UniProtKB/Swiss-Prot annotation:
GO terms for biological process: DNA recombination; DNA repair; SOS response. It comes from Brucella anthropi (strain ATCC 49188 / DSM 6882 / CCUG 24695 / JCM 21032 / LMG 3331 / NBRC 15819 / NCTC 12168 / Alc 37) (Ochrobactrum anthropi). This is Protein RecA. PANTHER family: MITOCHONDRIAL DNA REPAIR PROTEIN RECA HOMOLOG-RELATED (PTHR45900:SF1), RECA (PTHR45900). One of its GO terms (molecular function) is ATP binding. PROSITE patterns: RECA_1, RECA_2, RECA_3. Its main location: cytoplasm. SMART domains: AAA (SM00382). The lineage of its organism: Bacteria, Pseudomonadati, Pseudomonadota, Alphaproteobacteria, Hyphomicrobiales. ATP binds at residues 77-84. Pfam families: RecA (PF00154), RecA_C (PF21096).
């Protein structure tokens, strides 16, 4: 009885293998070679290429060393919180690696002088200032499908105005129009983005939901589609000012990884954004170095490998700016211990502050 049962299973498995092979060959004949494959036989597919964000602590918090290529990323936050700055830093890092980048400026507010200061190569940056939301997303789709773009930024979702709204009267009520536009565009874009290995960053604004009694009243514009399609969502906030004497020279910024499909989410980091200079890399090296024990702090003095960096944080930052080889050494050590730093020293912000679980009407 057991022999018959065993023979039956063997015959059944052979039949299943033959049936599967026939199905695979039929799919490949209908849709082309590579339309279906065994994942284990194509190991490079698993490797996820990333682009640094310009912030060492954020790269570590993301768990994979930066923002992922071939995925959709959403950066949202209040006004003047550093959303465009973070996107421009990512473009600059991609260009350093030889990548081609594009910027769809729906807000018509890109400052080329500031972008150059952040390290963006303006001569090789493609820029579009579309008239309507449909035009912006059509340009995005065409650039992505070309397969030549490495990073594409759309600034911002809130400024993607549907054609019907532009052609209508000022007081016309057109509920859900922008949400439908985004939903349709993302359905088209997702497969192209993955195939072309292009990272698309959507910058988004915050609105307030009316009549919310419990939970956060904040929501992002453009409906719910972007929340689902995005592999990474970053919530960026200004939490304070940096002063030199009485003059404000920068912002203290907090970024929370609200969603991450590639590593554990909810990591939270803080760094400085200096006016006219962007993310303060030396400030991050000092702060992360102290947390990880790479940089020693004794009273107000900072030192590295028994070498004094300076008295006070600002003096230590200036020393690293004047001695880039020491800064590179500290950065290399921190990147090598990224996993330990992310696990032990970066704050876990928790899932409670997820802006916009409900679509804006």
């Amino acid at each position: 009885m057991s022999q018959n049962s065993l023979r039956l299973v063997e015959e059944n498995s052979v039949d299943k293998t033959k049936a599967l092979d026939a199905a695979l060959s039929q799919i490949e004949r209908a849709f082309g070679k590579g339309s279906i494959m065994r994942l284990g036989k194509n190991a490079p597919v698993i490797e996820i290429e990333t682009v640094p964000t310009g912030s060492l602590s954020l790269d570590i918090a993301l768990g994979v060393g930066g923002l992922p290529k071939g995925r959709i990323v959403e950066i949202y936050g209040p006004e003047s919180s550093g959303k465009t700055t973070l996107a421009l830093h990512t473009i600059a890092e991609a260009q350093k690696k030889g990548g081609i980048c594009a910027f769809v400026d729906a807000e018509h507010a890109l400052d080329p002088v500031y972008a150059r200061k952040l390290g963006v190569d303006l001569e090789n940056l493609l820029i579009s200032q579309p008239d309507t939301g449909e035009q912006a997303l059509e340009i995005t789709d065409t650039l992505v499908r070309s397969g030549a773009i490495d990073v594409l930024v759309v600034d911002s979702v809130a400024a993607l105005t549907p054609r019907a709204e532009i052609e209508g009267e000022m007081g016309d009520s057109l509920p859900g129009l922008q949400a439908r536009l985004m939903s349709q565009a993302l359905r088209k874009l997702t497969a192209s983005i993955s195939r072309s290995n292009c990272m698309v960053i959507f910058i988004n604004q915050i609105r307030m939901k009316i009549g919310v009694m419990f939970g956060s009243p904040e929501t992002t514009t453009g409906g719910n589609a972007l929340k689902f399609y995005a592999s990474v969502r970053l919530d960026i906030r200004r939490i304070g000012s940096i002063k030199e004497r009485d003059e404000v020279v920068g912002n203290q910024t907090r970024v929370k990884v609200v969603k991450n499909k590639l590593a554990p989410p909810f990591k939270q980091v803080e760094f400085d954004i200096m006016y006219g200079a962007g993310v303060s890399k030396t400030g991050e090296l000092v702060d992360l170095g102290v947390k990880a024990g790479v940089v020693e702090k004794s009273g107000a003095w900072f030192s590295y490998n028994s070498q004094r960096l300076g008295q006070g944080r600002e003096n230590a930052k200036q020393y690293l700016k004047d001695n880039p080889e020491v800064a590179r050494e500290i950065e290399t050590t921190l990147r090598q211990n990224a996993g330990l730093i992310a696990e032990q020293f970066l704050e876990d912000g928790g899932p409670e502050d997820d802006a916009g679980d409900a679509a804006e009407m």
